């Protein structure tokens, strides 16, 4: 059979499977309201611009409903645009909405089946999350050691910001990556060319691209995973083959390094060495190597990339809103007197700095549409039908940019959290996911971001860059494409606030 005939046969089979999906699930109740689509492809074109979170809010307003739906190649997507809808399904009906859908591109082809963030809800997910919680969550015996690591590496960040302020993004990657690598693998990062930081950056970027809703049809049309790589439309397989190499290297390379040190008897205290030591002294069956390796990679991959994005947003906000920066510095000066750097013991006495962190998370949420949940069984909500297997998204961006909750939501204004202490907290409403699938490492991430923001504000002034004519350059609020909202690169000026601030920056050099 020639390739043209084979193509016709394969696509005919896929069409039959699609028709079975379309007509296989029926209900007397309607789906939630949806924008108009096209025959066969449905709303596929609405996913093309990487702005579904913004469009979904627009549709929600037009329909005067906080729940909307999309149909893409016969697959149903449900988008929840309010904290009430999110709580009703992801919290109150967690048993039906804590699963993840099949994501062939990321899981099957790129090979991210090791991360419990994407695992199906069940015993394997629970085991991986339990091990993570036992070692990384605050309140455990390792909490003070975590903060010691964060403080020490934050001091390094200040030195890097002074030495090369124009390379703030590389400095932030060094900071967040070093904390995770030290805590997880006992690895010391020397400079920005560290191979493990470069590796996680490349691997995370590939996954961010792959996770965009509708970016790869195989996620909406899983039958496509069976077509051969040379077949028309199978370019995704070739791309995934290259990305899989990054995934495998990210899982194995730092683990092999840490295990090698442990076997030689010179391992530093870290997650991997703690697990391996636990296995040596365990009376019964210890943790499998796969479980240790997988859990370490989750911390390595998730912690570094999202925290970098948030801290870059912080730098952007301070560049654009100097009055906010001055207010935070006044709070810090009143407490510290310019004589020392902040530490975690100061947190309760720096409410405005904490408000800045909340506003950064609200203004540009790292995961605007979060990761989709899956309806295990067919369900009804508000008189609408939700079919089994539907992708169910919590639209964090729509929730955190709702003008009925946050006045003037496009403006960066931390004062809103000071003026109204009961205002919806972004930390608990989408920034770290929803329900039982909320990010397990959020406490460590929040500490990493808070101490960096407080320390930078204590000793640096951040302002707009100027062009060759001396005119200020106002950076646009522009995001790079991908699932994770990274601010596009922008120039700014970062310089010590004073001679006393410079002495604090260089005191440990």
From Swiss-Prot:
Entry binding sites for heme: 439
Compartments reported by the entry: Membrane
Entry's transmembrane regions: 4-24
PROSITE patterns, alphabetized: CYTOCHROME_P450
An annotated GO cellular component: membrane
Cystine pairs: none
Membrane topology value: Single-pass membrane protein
Glycosylation sites: 96, 279
Keyword Transferase tagged: no
Record keywords, A-Z: Glycoprotein, Heme, Iron, Membrane, Metal-binding, Monooxygenase, Oxidoreductase, Transmembrane, Transmembrane helix
Pathway(s) annotated for this protein in UniProt: Secondary metabolite biosynthesis
Biotech utility: Melleolide sesquiterpene aryl esters are cytotoxic secondary products with anti-cancer potential. Armillaridin shows therapeutic and radiosensitizing effects on human esophageal cancer cells. Armillaridin induces autophagy-associated cell death in human chronic myelogenous leukemia as well as of hepatocellular carcinoma cells. Armillaridin can also inhibit the differentiation and activation of human macrophages and thus might have potential to be developed as a biological response modifier for inflammatory diseases.
Cofactor: heme
Domain of life: Eukaryota
Single GO molecular function: heme binding
E.C. designation(s): 1.-.-.-
SUPFAM superfamilies hit by this protein: Cytochrome P450
Purpose: Cytochrome P450 monooxygenase, part of the gene cluster that mediates the biosynthesis of melleolides, a range of antifungal and phytotoxic polyketide derivatives composed of an orsellinic acid (OA) moiety esterified to various sesquiterpene alcohols. The first step in melleolides biosynthesis is performed by the delta(6)-protoilludene synthase PRO1 which catalyzes the cyclization of farnesyl diphosphate to protoilludene. The orsellinic acid synthase armB produces OA by condensing acetyl-CoA with 3 malonyl-CoA units in a three-round chain elongation reaction folowed by a C2-C7 ring closure.
Miscellaneous comment in the UniProt entry for this protein: Armillaria species are both devastating forest pathogens and some of the largest and oldest terrestrial organisms on Earth. They forage for hosts and achieve immense colony sizes via rhizomorphs, root-like multicellular structures of clonal dispersal. One genetic Armillaria gallica individual localized in Michigan's Upper Peninsula stands out as exceptionally large, covering hundreds of tree root systems over approximately 75 hectares of the forest floor. Based on observed growth rates of the fungus, the minimum age of this large individual can be estimated as 2500 years.
Family per record: Belongs to the cytochrome P450 family.
Protein name: Cytochrome P450 monooxygenase ARMGADRAFT_974139
């Amino acid at each position: 059979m020639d390739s043209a005939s084979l193509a016709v046969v394969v696509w005919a089979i896929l069409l039959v499977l699609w028709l079975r999906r379309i007509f296989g699930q029926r209900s007397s109740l309607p789906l939630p309201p949806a924008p108009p689509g096209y025959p066969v492809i449905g709303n596929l074109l609405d996913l093309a611009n990487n702005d579904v979170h913004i469009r979904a809010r627009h549709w929600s307003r037009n329909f005067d409903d906080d729940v909307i739906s999309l149909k893409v190649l016969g697959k149903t997507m449900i988008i929840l645009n309010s904290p009430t809808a999110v709580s009703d399904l992801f919290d109150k009906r967690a048993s039906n909405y804590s699963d993840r859908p099949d994501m062939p591109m990321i899981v099957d082809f790129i090979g991210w089946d090791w991360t419990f963030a994407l695992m199906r809800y069940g015993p394997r997910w629970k085991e991986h999350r339990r091990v993570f919680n036992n070692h990384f969550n605050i309140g455990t015996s390792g909490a003070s050691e975590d903060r010691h690591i964060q403080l020490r590496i934050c001091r390094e960040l200040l030195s890097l910001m002074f030495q090369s302020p124009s390379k703030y993004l590389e400095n932030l990657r060094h900071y967040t990556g070093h904390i995770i690598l030290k805590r997880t693998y006992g690895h010391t990062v020397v400079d920005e060319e560290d191979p493990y930081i470069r590796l996680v950056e490349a691997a995370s970027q590939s996954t961010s691209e792959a996770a965009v809703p509708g970016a790869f049809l195989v996620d909406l049309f899983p039958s496509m995973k069976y077509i051969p790589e040379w077949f028309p439309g199978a370019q995704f397989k070739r791309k995934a083959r290259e990305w899989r190499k990054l995934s495998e290297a990210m899982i194995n390379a730092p683990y092999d390094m840490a295990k090698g040190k442990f076997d030689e008897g010179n391992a530093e205290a870290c997650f991997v060495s703690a697990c391996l030591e636990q296995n040596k002294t365990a009376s019964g069956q210890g943790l499998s190597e796969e479980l240790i390796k997988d859990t370490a990679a989750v911390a390595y991959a998730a912690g570094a990339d999202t925290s970098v994005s948030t801290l870059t947003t912080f730098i952007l906000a301070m560049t654009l809103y100097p009055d906010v920066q001055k207010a935070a510095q006044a709070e810090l000066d009143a407490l510290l007197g310019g004589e020392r750097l902040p530490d975690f013991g100061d947190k309760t006495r720096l409410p405005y700095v904490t408000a800045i962190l909340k506003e950064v998370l609200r203004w540009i949420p790292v995961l605007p549409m979060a990761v989709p949940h899956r309806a295990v069984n067919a369900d009804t909500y508000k008189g609408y039908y939700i079919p089994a297997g539907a992708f169910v998204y919590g639209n964090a961006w729509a929730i955190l940019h709702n003008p009925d909750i946050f006045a003037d939501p496009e403006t960066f204004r931390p004062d809103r959290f000071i003026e109204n202490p009961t205002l919806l907290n972004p930390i608990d409403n989408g920034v770290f996911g929803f329900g039982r699938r909320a990010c397990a490492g959020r406490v460590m991430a929040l500490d990493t971001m808070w101490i960096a923001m407080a320390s930078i504000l204590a000793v640096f002034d951040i302002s707009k860059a100027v062009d060759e004519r001396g005119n200020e350059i106002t950076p646009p609020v522009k995001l790079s494409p991908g699932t994770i909202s990274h601010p596009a690169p922008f120039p700014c000026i970062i310089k010590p606030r004073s001679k006393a601030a410079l002495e604090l920056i260089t005191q440990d050099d």
